[in-house]
Amino acid sequence: MPKHILIFDSGIGGLSVYKEIKYQLPLAKYIYAFDNAAFPYGELTESVLIERTTHIISELCSQFPIDIVVIACNTASTVVLPSLRDKLDIPVVGVVPAIKPAALVSNKIGLLATPATVKRSYTYDLIKSFAPISDVQLLGSTRLVEMAEEKMIGIDVDMRAKRDLSPWQNKVDTIVLGCTHFPFLKNEIKKALGNKILLIDSGEAIARRVKQLLNGDGVESAVLFEGEVFCSAPSIKEEALNHTFKELNFSSLQCLGYPKF
């Protein structure tokens, strides 16, 4: 039997984390779930975030022999991890903005995240702990999250991304990608702010942690398993989404039927 890894996000940005884990554990069985009914998570209250993530993840854990859960969403990770860890008897891994590695290489840092992440005390505690003498500028953008989703189904977002990032022109030299959607906008960010800008995300570190918790054993056979993907509500972009997921070795989109309200 393969190890079953559940990756969860509000949208499809968590696929950036999936790619890193898949590289480390290519033969595991992957279940990807995203809560598109409540996308984007950056605009939800903490209580709603906890309720939705707990419900969806618990349902999938009852359907599959999940070995580990990865919350591939910075916004959710700052809120839901304690509740999930109390409820589940398997490891739950979250995403932390990569402030610490950024502070090791620069003192002109930009943290690009959702509005919710940049407002939370958790984020300021990270900065205080790991970058106390650095100039850390915060930019919270729901629009960039939406652009990443659009790009992943083939829509061009170059010029819009440049406008949203213009406040950082010549002000930062290192950017922490504090949302799992943003690795998909690396080219657009470099076009907007210059190719010399250093972009840092947490994907590789998460993959190493998952591998460690699974004792380095992603699978017990040499079979390549097709992943399964679930959304919380029907999507008008289903055809484009299925194309994206098929390229990443997932089956067709399945709907859990969990509306926003």
UniProtKB/Swiss-Prot annotation:
Annotated metabolic or biological route of this protein: Cell wall biogenesis; peptidoglycan biosynthesis
Pfam families: Asp_Glu_race
EC number: 5.1.1.3
SUPFAM superfamilies reported for this sequence: Aspartate/glutamate racemase
Functional summary from the UniProt entry: Provides the (R)-glutamate required for cell wall biosynthesis.
Keywords: Cell shape, Cell wall biogenesis/degradation, Isomerase, Peptidoglycan synthesis
Recorded name of the encoding gene: murI
The protein's name: Glutamate racemase
Gene3D superfamilies: 3.40.50.1860
Top EC group: isomerase
Signal peptide span: none
Binding-site list for substrate: D9, S10, Y41, G42, N74, T75, T180, H181
UniProt source species: Aliivibrio fischeri (strain MJ11) (Vibrio fischeri)
Catalyzed reactions per annotation: L-glutamate = D-glutamate
GO biological process: cell wall organization; peptidoglycan biosynthetic process; regulation of cell shape
HAMAP family (UniProt xref): Glu_racemase
Upper lineage: Bacteria, Pseudomonadati, Pseudomonadota, Gammaproteobacteria, Vibrionales
Similarity comment: family membership: Belongs to the aspartate/glutamate racemases family.
A GO term, aspect molecular function: glutamate racemase activity
Keyword presence, Cell wall biogenesis/degradation: yes
Catalytic residue positions: C73 (proton donor/acceptor), C179 (proton donor/acceptor)
